[in-house]
Amino acid sequence: MPHSYDYDAIVIGSGPGGEGAAMGLVKQGARVAVIERYQNVGGGCTHWGTIPSKALRHAVSRIIEFNQNPLYSDHSRLLRSSFADILNHADNVINQQTRMRQGFYERNHCEILQGNARFVDEHTLALDCPDGSVETLTAEKFVIACGSRPYHPTDVDFPHPRIYDSDSILSMHHEPRHVLIYGAGVIGCEYASIFRGMDVKVDLINTRDRLLAFLDQEMSDSLSYHFWNSGVVIRHNEEYEKIEGCDDGVIMHLKSGKKLKADCLLYANGRTGNTDSLALQNIGLETDSRGQLKVNSMYQTAQPHVYAVGDVIGYPSLASAAYDQGRIAAQALVKGEATAHLIEDIPTGIYTIPEISSVGKTEQQLTAMKVPYEVGRAQFKHLARAQIVGMNVGTLKILFHRETKEILGIHCFGERAAEIIHIGQAIMEQKGGGNTIEYFVNTTFNYPTMAEAYRVAALNGLNRLF
């Protein structure tokens, strides 16, 4: 007789990956429970990561826009807002997102269980509940979607009230005048924009030789220049020797011999998977040094009945991709295989001020591959819509094959870049000759719009051909 389990599948984590898996499973008729360690669903994305940081960024960018607009600004007086004020805006967005996502589970009759899960054996979980009790749950299959957390080196005193990571920064209760940010990845650069936009002095410590080296170099250089122009001090190729927490701030000793002091430190250098409490050794699974699990194309781990999605499997570590991974894993879990798969060119959105977004190859990659490409550019300052709304800083760059006209990569720097990129992405995904830069010349755009940048860039690129 077949074994009887409490559930067909248990999903550990309610972030984008867990939500995608849970919704995919219940839509296929599976009996599903979702385990969430916190009181509210949504995971790190909703409560400490994507949603609050982007809400902060939006509030700050609107303040900057107001202060720079000659129609509204009185140059003898600037509009200012406290960190607490803009955190309130983020809290409102978080609450809306939480209620909406809670509704998804309720409407689909998906059970939510609060507590910390750990494996007892291959088909059994122990759930440590908030009241101290322990429940035993069984399932035929599992999806691990427990996300990640900021990496904490053992020699950094994170309990110190002036030393923050990208989670605890959202609980800041003082108004800093000077911030040190260690780590110039996506999170570090986004918070550098936020704090500098609030007129806070920022020292950005980069352990590498340029910002966001995975980007097209022109985009990286544009961000570096914009930071320099706004007053952010960037220190490349630096590593800390020692970090001292003081009563009035933080002192950072760098291996190069420099010493820096500021009101507080945001440590934003790396993340680690939330797998250490799952007792994975009880089911024969091991993680790498970052707490991440290896999976196959269907998101199965080394144990075929255990799947993993989202940050816990590493690249690309994007909320958008995690949801799709969960949906694909759900299909594979129920049907034995998945017909869906992640798209080849996943767009990247970086919410600095201004935004950066890209999809496809960079100039550096195409040059190394010896692909005969050409470049088409549109400067935002030449677009009527950008002039109307005062968003003159920015550019759209299209890389395309000189002979076939196929679009190979699109890169955008400027306000609304993460939205603008999807127009080009839609054309890049077309098959059978549909992916061509000539589409943008032969179609009619609304006028005036930021989308018109595609027509301008396409004409600019095609005019370079001979």
UniProtKB/Swiss-Prot annotation:
Its cofactor is FAD. Its main location: cytoplasm. One of its GO terms (cellular component) is cytosol. One of its GO terms (molecular function) is flavin adenine dinucleotide binding. InterPro entries: Class-I_Pyr_Nuc-Dis_Oxidored, FAD/NAD-bd_sf, FAD/NAD-binding_dom, FAD/NAD-linked_Rdtase_dimer_sf, Pyr_nuc-diS_OxRdtase, Pyr_nucl-diS_OxRdtase_dimer, STH_gammaproteobact. It comes from the Bacteria. Binds 1 FAD per subunit. GO terms for biological process: 2-oxoglutarate metabolic process; NADP metabolic process. It catalyses: NAD(+) + NADPH = NADH + NADP(+). Keywords: Cytoplasm, FAD, Flavoprotein, NAD, NADP, Oxidoreductase. It is found in: Cytoplasm. FAD binds at E36, R37, Y38, Q39, N40, V41, G42, G43, G44, C45. It is an enzyme of class 1 (oxidoreductase). Belongs to the class-I pyridine nucleotide-disulfide oxidoreductase family. Conversion of NADPH, generated by peripheral catabolic pathways, to NADH, which can enter the respiratory chain for energy generation. This is Soluble pyridine nucleotide transhydrogenase. It comes from Escherichia coli O127:H6 (strain E2348/69 / EPEC). The gene is sthA.
